[in-house]
C-alpha cells in the first residue's frame, strides 16, 4: 500500500516539471512525457520513490537518527517550518549558512549566543541596560533567531537531510555529501538526481506539492519515533490506469493553454 496515491499527487500538481529547455538529462528516467515545452513527471515512479524514502526515514528515526528539513525558497519556507515542528525535528528555511554541517562547532557558538540573549531578555537583564544597547541586542537576537531558530535545540550534526529543491540548496547538498550524510529530496526535472540518495521526483515549485510530500516525510518521522500508524493510501491497478489517463489529460490541457 503506497504512502501517496496517484490521485493525491495529481491533485497537488506534483507531476508538473520545468520547461524542457531547463531540464537535466539525468532526470530522463523520471519523465512521463512532454507537452508544450513542459515536462510531465512519471507519477508511478514518484509513488515508488516516495515509499522508499518514507521507509528509510521511518527506520532511521526509529534508531534515534536526527532529520534536518531544508527549504529556503518562498514556496517551501512555511511548510518546512510547520512540518519539522510537527514531527519534533529541526529546520533551515531562511538561508543556509556556510559551514552549518562542516563547521558545526562555529555554528554552535552562534546558537549559544542566541540562547544567551534569550536568557537575558527573560531574566530581566534587558530592563537594567541602556535602551540603545537593548535595541541592538534585540536586533542581534532576532537576526540569529531568523537563521538559527530552527536548529537552536539540535544536539549534533543531523544524520539525514530532507531537502526541497537540491539545485537551490546546492551548498547544503555539497556539505552533506562531504560528510556522508544521506539526502532525501524532492527532485524536479532541472535537478541532478545522482547527488541525492533518496530521490522523490516531483514539482518543487508548487506549494501544494511541497506540502503534500513534506508532510509525509514528517509522518515517517513521527511513526519512527512514536510508533504512530498513519493510514496508508491504497491504489488499485484501475486507479493507476485512471491516474495515468489523467496525467495525459493534464498534459493535453497544457497544449490548449
Swiss-Prot record:
Residues 229-257 are annotated as: Disordered. The keyword Ribosomal protein applies. One of its GO terms (biological process) is translation. Transmembrane segments: none annotated. Keywords: Ribonucleoprotein, Ribosomal protein. The keyword Ribosomal protein applies. It comes from the Bacteria. One of its GO terms (cellular component) is cytosolic small ribosomal subunit. InterPro entries: Ribosomal_uS2, Ribosomal_uS2_bac/mit/plastid, Ribosomal_uS2_CS, Ribosomal_uS2_flav_dom_sf. Pfam families: Ribosomal_S2 (PF00318). Belongs to the universal ribosomal protein uS2 family. PANTHER family: 30S RIBOSOMAL PROTEIN S2 PROKARYOTIC AND ORGANELLAR, SMALL RIBOSOMAL SUBUNIT PROTEIN US2M. NCBIfam families: rpsB_bact. This is Small ribosomal subunit protein uS2. It comes from Caldicellulosiruptor bescii (strain ATCC BAA-1888 / DSM 6725 / KCTC 15123 / Z-1320) (Anaerocellum thermophilum).
Amino acid at each position: 500500500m503506497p504512502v501517496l496515491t496517484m490521485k493525491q499527487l495529481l491533485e497537488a500538481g506534483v507531476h508538473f516539471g520545468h520547461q524542457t529547455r531547463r531540464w537535466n538529462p539525468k532526470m530522463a528516467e523520471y519523465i512521463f512525457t512532454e507537452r508544450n515545452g513542459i515536462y510531465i513527471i512519471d507519477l508511478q515512479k514518484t509513488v515508488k520513490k516516495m515509499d522508499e524514502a518514507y521507509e528509510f526515514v521511518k527506520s532511521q528515526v526509529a534508531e534515534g537518527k536526527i532529520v534536518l528539513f531544508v527549504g529556503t525558497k518562498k514556496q517551501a519556507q512555511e511548510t518546512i517550518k510547520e512540518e519539522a515542528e510537527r514531527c519534533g525535528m529541526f529546520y533551515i528555511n531562511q538561508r543556509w549558512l556556510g559551514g552549518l554541517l562542516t563547521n558545526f562547532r562555529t555554528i554552535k557558538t552562534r546558537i549559544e549566543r542566541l540562547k544567551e540573549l534569550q536568557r537575558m531578555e527573560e531574566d530581566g537583564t534587558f530592563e537594567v541596560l541602556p535602551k540603545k544597547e537593548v535595541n541592538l541586542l534585540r536586533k542581534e537576537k532576532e537576526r540569529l533567531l531568523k537563521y538559527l531558530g530552527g536548529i537552536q535545540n539540535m544536539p549534533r550534526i543531523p544524520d539525514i537531510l530532507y531537502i526541497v529543491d537540491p539545485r537551490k540548496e546546492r551548498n547544503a547538498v555539497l556539505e552533506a555529501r562531504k560528510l556522508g550524510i544521506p539526502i532525501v529530496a524532492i527532485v524536479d526535472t532541472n535537478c541532478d538526481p545522482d547527488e541525492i540518495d533518496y530521490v522523490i521526483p516531483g514539482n518543487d515549485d508548487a506549494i501544494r506539492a511541497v506540502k503534500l510530500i513534506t508532510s509525509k516525510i514528517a509522518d515517517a518521522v513521527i511513526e519512527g519515533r512514536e510508533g504512530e500508524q498513519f493510514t496508508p493510501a491504497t491504489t488499485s491497478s484501475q486507479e493507476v490506469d485512471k491516474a495515468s489517463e489523467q496525467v495525459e489529460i493534464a498534459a493535453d490541457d497544457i497544449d490548449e493553454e
